[in-house]
Design a protein with these regions (language model features):
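Active-site histidine-acidic residue metal-binding/catalytic motifs
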Residues: 75-77, 168, 179, 203, ...
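Solvent-exposed helix-loop boundary motif
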Residues: 75-171, 180-218, 239-244, 248-249, ...
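Primarily short, surface-exposed interaction patches in extracytoplasmic proteins
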Residues: 238-270, 274-309, 323-374, 407, ...
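Globin-like tetrapyrrole-binding proteins
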Residues: 870
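Long, intrinsically disordered low-complexity tandem-repeat segments
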Residues: 27-51
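Bacterial N-terminal signal peptides
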Residues: 54-68
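Boundary at the C-terminal end of the N-terminal hydrophobic targeting segment
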Residues: 66, 70-77
Length: 884
């Protein structure tokens, strides 16, 4: 009884202690909000003219600055800029359905326009017909078009209700504003699409243009009559990086001067996040500052490019482009347990600086390349082809022919936007409305992919292809295991044979027949014999089930039947034309590089890889240089990075784009060379704190300064873990449990994304991601106030700082350096000291007001809680998640 009383007292003390600590944490959170409010007014917080640069601090702070935000109401501006992703959604998911199911009765070409409704134009849909407007943007439930598709009111199309998948596409389209790029009016049909040769002069389809005599070009730009001389801006001294020739010559033409270079600590943080996705450690900072000033920056670049964390950072960018995920999504959201092998292949390839042409070739046709002697390398070539398999698939689609062509359509969409920078999938149902791609072009490439096996079977719920990755070590394991199975089988057989003598000895059978077999089968067994036989059987079955399996990877292989595809009328696989299109690529693109002939017994993937990676190809190098530039500057040279077509934007610096692409190819397609060339330019190293030309060039199109950029979700989470010394930076296969690994290793479930993904603008992983948007929403501030990741990081780092020093000034300095990557100013130190004292006093006051708990109060606990609240406030500042 006495023992039970002691245990009860200990339990009550523990509850009081936990309650006290919880109270401290809650008060610390409230104080952190107050701290963030104070710090926000001081810590490098600037509101620019862009909505995307709002302060990400607690909601109360957002309220203080609300009056400073620009008017962002809809309808302002001289030209409507449609979201590219929504335009592509309309072109690939909405327009084809309208063409196939509605145009016959509701277009300008209809003999009789039924119900006075035209759906072949944007204005026709909005205007509607006899029953009124067909669409109410953002209100699907009020839109007659959706009601008709649902068969609630009128029933359209009359030949049969469309699938739930298509109807859901229309619901989504209307809910997101019914974006429609068509410009024709209801009484003026769109101009028929032109012949491909009419667009032959488009800049993106021309060969790369090498420049001769760069210094002369620079001089010509200086003396160009188009140069703006009104401000008498002198051209800066001859640059050492070729990139700066082009940028500074353009600035001179515009009458603009470049911004100054950013200071050393800003460059350290910028470069560390750009190349590794992680903040610099205190040790890295000290080494950087101790390097010779004239070599400091270049040495830092080399160290970061050599870090294995470089591969983890830049693989995430590529995975966005190729719609990487760990589950199928769509109708059957099955886990893709081996998708991670492709992800790890990308990380390893980037860390090894695999040439980009080889990087692309292996993904397109790695299984068809000459197999290397090294078995690991052979398996990597197979794994690389997972690129084709990663997309979402309608696994339960019972029309397997439709399922297959839809898979091919998704593959074409991802391939064309990622590798070619064009929207070829828009030509499935009709000739491309804007670009020189015909339906024949589409089905020429579709034939290559239809001749490639992506699906393992055509079952009720189909399965994607997975291929074995055999190794000699695993072969030996399997051989040894098979030997054990054979031995167990033989032992069991002998055990059964030995029962003959046992039965005779027991007198159960008076004699054996001449054949010595049949009576033994029918004779009785002793319990001991039964037990031995059962154990031997269990052992054998266990061995058989435990046969070591070969690793498997999502991958493709050549299909048994190679096919040339017929053009499908309006994209409908049930309406093939009589003419078959030879396997190949768009004809407009073979002007610069001829496409190799495809033998009848080959799919054409090998020829596709050879053609695409030819140094003379006009698109691949341009597209990738533009993307790398975008990920370093926050904006690309071509502002539509996945659409180099006629509706895409022209490059701001066309000579720079071509020159950099040509030199990259000459350097062996080395991505690390390309990174080094970009980040060592003056253009990259400029400060973002310059507002001289905000009015004349608000988007910084002419690169007169560096752009301020917000971190994506992954480096935000990784920084919280790294700052609190909790990050598990190991690369490689999945580990048991999620743990504090880098965010690239988080599970991406297409049907159930973690809330953390959506808070910071991670977009739909079911399709190619051109560029992540940057939005400002209240949930981001709430994330920093309430999310356990932030509170745990704050408490952990606060405890670490409290233990490392008893001097508050040293603790404040350490917190600033760990969280923000810089030393605090003297005024920031004074304000922070005041906050810490305020926090300690408040905690002590709360402790006195709390009924006695019987637990001795540790004053150091107040200081630790105050430092945790202080760190929480630093995490909540804008400076933490923005790269200057």
């Amino acid at each position: 009884m006495e023992w039970q009383n002691v245990k009860r007292d200990e339990c009550q003390k523990r509850k009081r202690r936990n309650s006290f600590q919880l109270g401290i944490r809650r008060l610390a959170t409230r104080l952190a909000t107050r701290l963030a409010t104070r710090l926000t007014a001081r810590l490098a917080i600037r509101l620019s003219t862009s909505l995307s640069t709002r302060v990400i601090v607690p909601t109360v702070v957002l309220g203080l600055f609300a009056s400073s935000l620009p008017n962002t109401s809809l309808g302002q501006g001289t030209e409507e800029q449609l979201p590219q992703a929504q335009v592509e959604f309309f072109e690939s998911r909405i327009r084809p359905v309208l063409i196939e199911h509605c145009y016959e009765c509701h277009s300008a070409d209809s003999k009789i326009v039924q119900a006075n409704l035209l759906v072949d134009t944007k204005s026709g849909l909005l205007q509607g017909g006899d029953s009124g407007p067909s669409l109410v943007p953002n209100q699907p439930d009020q839109s007659l078009l959706l009601k008709a598709l649902l068969y609630e009111d009128s029933q359209m199309p009359p030949k049969g209700k469309l699938s739930d998948e298509i109807i859901n596409d229309f619901r989504k389209w209307i809910a997101e504003g019914a974006i429609d790029p068509r410009t024709a009016t209801a009484n003026r049909p769109e101009k028929p699409w032109i012949d491909p040769t009419a667009a032959a002069t488009h800049w993106a389809f021309q060969p790369l243009k090498p420049l001769q005599g760069l210094s002369q070009v620079y001089s010509n730009d200086l003396n160009s009559p188009t140069s703006t001389q009104s401000n008498n801006h002198p051209l800066v001294a001859s640059p050492t990086n070729r990139i700066d020739y082009f940028v500074e010559a353009t600035l001179h033409k515009k009458g603009m001067l470049p911004a100054a270079q950013a200071d050393a600590m800003v460059l350290l943080r910028r470069l560390s996040f750009d190349l590794t996705g992680l903040p610099p450690t205190l040790e890295e900072t000290e080494r950087y500052l101790n390097d010779p000033p004239e070599l400091r920056y270049e040495l830092l670049v080399d160290r970061l490019l050599s870090s294995p964390q470089y591969g983890a950072r830049w693989a995430r960018h590529w995975l966005d482009s190729v719609r990487y995920a760990n589950s199928n999504g769509a109708d059957e959201n099955h886990e893709m347990p081996n998708a991670w092998r492709y992800r790890d292949w990308v990380v390893d390839a980037l860390n090894e600086d695999l040439s980009f042409d080889a990087f692309v070739r292996q993904q397109i046709a790695g299984d068809l390349l000459p197999p290397p002697d090294d078995e690991i390398q052979r398996n990597r070539l197979i794994t690389a082809t997972g690129f084709w398999v990663l997309g979402p698939k309608m696994l339960a689609e019972q029309d397997k022919a439709k399922m297959q062509i839809d898979i091919v359509d998704e593959q074409i969409d991802t391939f064309s936007r990622t590798m070619l920078g064009v929207t070829l999938s828009c030509a499935r149902c009709h000739d491309h409305k804007f670009d020189p791609f015909t339906q024949k072009d589409y089905f020429a490439l579709a034939g290559v992919l239809m001749s490639t096996r992506t699906m393992a079977d055509q079952a009720f719920v189909s399965n994607w292809m997975e291929r074995e990755l055999p190794t000699q070590a695993r072969h030996e394991q399997r051989a040894a295991h098979q030997a054990a199975i054979d031995e167990a089988t033989q032992a069991r057989h002998l055990l059964l044979m030995k029962t003959h003598q046992d039965l005779l000895d027991q007198g159960k059978i008076p004699q054996l027949p001449e054949n010595n077999k049949e009576p033994i089968k029918d004779g009785p067994y002793t319990e001991e014999m039964k037990k031995q036989i059962e154990e031997s059987q269990k052992h054998l079955e266990s061995l058989q089930k435990g046969m070591p399996a070969f690793d498997r990877a999502m991958a493709v292989e050549e299909a048994k039947e190679k096919v040339d595809m017929p053009v499908h009328l309006r994209g409908n696989h049930l309406k093939p034309s009589d003419e078959r299109v030879p396997r190949g690529v768009p004809k407009i693109l073979v002007k610069a590089v001829e496409f190799p002939s495809i033998p009848p017994d080959q799919s054409g993937r090998m020829q596709l890889a050879d053609w695409l990676t030819n140094p003379q190809h006009p698109l691949l190098a341009r597209v990738m240089v533009n993307r790398i530039w975008m990920w370093h500057f926050g904006q690309p040279l071509v502002s539509t990075p996945s659409n180099f077509g006629l509706k895409g934007q022209s490059p701001s610096h066309p000579e720079l784009l071509d020159d950099l692409a040509i030199r990259w190819i000459e350097q062996g397609w080395s991505l690390k060379w390309l990174h080094r060339e970009i980040v060592t330019s003056e253009a990259y190293r400029r400060t973002s704190r310059d507002a001289r030309y905000e009015e004349s060039d608000p988007e910084n199109r002419w690169l007169w300064k560096q752009n301020e950029r917000r971190l994506e979700m992954e480096p935000i989470r990784d920084s919280l873990l790294a700052c609190s010394s909790r990050l598990d930076a190991r690369l490689g296969p999945p580990l048991k449990g999620e743990g504090p690994r880098r965010s690239i290793y988080l599970n991406i479930n297409r049907a159930a994304l973690d809330d953390l993904f959506s808070v910071f603008d991670y977009v739909d992983p079911a399709s190619h991601i051109e560029q992540r948007p940057v939005t400002t929403v209240p949930s981001q501030a709430l994330f920093f106030l309430n999310n356990p990741i932030v509170s745990t990081a704050s408490e952990t780092l606060g405890e670490q700082i409290a233990k490392s020093s008893q001097d508050d000034r040293e603790s404040i300095d350490q917190a600033f350096r760990k969280v923000l990557g810089r030393a605090p100013s003297s005024r920031e130190i004074d304000r922070s000291l005041s906050f810490l004292q305020l926090c300690v006093d408040a905690l002590a006051e709360q402790s006195q007001a709390t009924p006695a708990t019987g637990v001795p109060v540790d004053k150091q606990q107040y200081r630790t809680a105050a430092l945790s609240a202080f760190v929480h406030g630093l995490f909540s500042t804008r400076e933490f998640i923005w790269i200057e």
